[in-house]
């Protein structure tokens, strides 16, 4: 059973899509989607199509590094912005400064 699941995007209507983000009990991060609608039926011959990407816990440091690099690249205020982001999202962190 997944320890935490949230829906991060949803499109209602004839061409339905739901995108979920899951943190599994073993630390795996998974992003998956479900499509329902006439396009799915036409292409796959079924009423729904599900697909996703899983990143094992052992790869999370690399994932975090690359996401942070992409988010903050070129920003001179990156340290302050990162500290604020961690605080806002309840991510345990430590701020340090020295002279």
Regions found by a protein language model. Name each.
Residues 20-57:
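A short, structured beta-strand/loop element
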Residues 1-29:
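Short, charged/polar N-terminal "headpieces" of proteins
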């Amino acid at each position: 059973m997944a320890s935490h699941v949230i829906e991060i995007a949803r499109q209602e209507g004839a061409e339905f899509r739901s995108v979920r983000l899951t943190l599994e009990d073993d630390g795996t991060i998974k992003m998956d989607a479900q499509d329902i609608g006439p396009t799915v039926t036409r292409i796959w011959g079924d009423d729904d199509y599900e697909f996703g990407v899983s990143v094992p816990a052992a790869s999370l440091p690399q994932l975090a590094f690359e996401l942070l690099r992409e988010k903050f690249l070129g920003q001179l205020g990156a340290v302050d912005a990162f500290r604020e982001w961690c605080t806002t999202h309840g991510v345990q962190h430590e701020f340090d400064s020295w002279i």
